[in-house]
From Swiss-Prot:
Family: Belongs to the TACO1 family.
Any one Gene Ontology molecular-function term assigned to this protein's record: DNA binding
Subcellular location per the Swiss-Prot or TrEMBL entry: Cytoplasm
Protein name per its UniProtKB record: Probable transcriptional regulatory protein Mfla_2355
A GO biological-process term: regulation of DNA-templated transcription
């Protein structure tokens, strides 16, 4: 990826997320509800719920919205029963895609995903066709200029799997999904605030898209992320400005 700045890509991605703040609340409500349903309503014993609640607080979601979502998940309040579904497929030039949905209508979800992929030059694949190209892990990114030694010491002591310093000076901390929240809290307690922190599907290899192909791929990703049932989209594609 010669000439490609990972830091620039992260900033671009954060900008896109901020522009879709309205949908972020909807996604987080769904995630909190499903997390509570699957693992219980106590954040101390449910790492997935703990991470979702922490993200909701960072996005300034009102506390009563968070509490209601947890209660819907535990059954204390009536709510929609969302099902988790993962679709795999391909985008422009065969770029791998993983599309995670939370939906109350599986038929609608798959029809919408298939339609967007077909419309934008991609196609839906079979289960497992691209998942092997990604690693399920926690990722925390620190901006260039952050002390590598401080991050390394705090992260590894808290149980992180790896600390990677990129050519542009940004630092990535990789964790097991179950250790993500503990590592994030340990780093923040040490005064180290990540600019991006998420449990994600991290591609083993990335392909840089630029020019017309980059524009097409970005349109495809945006269209998928705009679907109501879609929670997350992971790809091997990196869009270069």
């Amino acid at each position: 990826m010669a000439g490609h700045s990972k830091w620039a890509n992260i900033q671009h991605r954060k900008g896109r997320q901020d522009a879709k703040r309205g949908k972020i609340f909807t996604k987080l409500i769904k995630e909190i509800t499903v997390s509570a349903r699957m693992g219980g309503g106590d954040v101390n014993f449910n790492p997935r719920l703990r991470a979702a609640v922490a993200e909701a607080k960072e996005q300034n979601m009102p506390a009563e919205n968070i509490i209601r979502a947890i209660k819907r998940g535990t059954g204390e309040l009536e709510g929609v029963n969302y099902e988790e579904i993962r679709y795999e497929g391909y985008g422009i030039n065969g770029a791998a895609l993983i599309i995670d949905c939370l939906t109350d209508n599986k038929q609608r979800a798959v029809a919408d995903v298939r339609h967007v992929l077909s419309k934008h030059g991609g196609n839906l694949g079979t289960d497992g066709c691209v998942a092997f190209m990604f690693k399920h892990c926690g990722v925390l990114v620190f901006e260039p200029g952050t002390s590598e030694d401080q991050v390394m010491e705090a992260a590894l002591e808290a149980g992180a799997e790896d600390v990677i310093t990129d050519e542009d000076g940004s630092i990535e901390v990789i964790t097991a999904p179950g250790d993500f929240t503990a590592v994030k809290e340990a780093l923040e307690a040490a005064g180290l605030k990540p600019v991006l922190a998420e449990v994600t599907m991290k591609p083993d290899n990335e392909t840089v898209f630029s020019g017309e192909d980059g524009v097409k791929m970005q349109k495809l990703l945006d269209a998928l992320e705009d679907l109501d049932d879609v929670q997350e989209v992971y790809t091997t594609a990196v869009i270069e400005e």
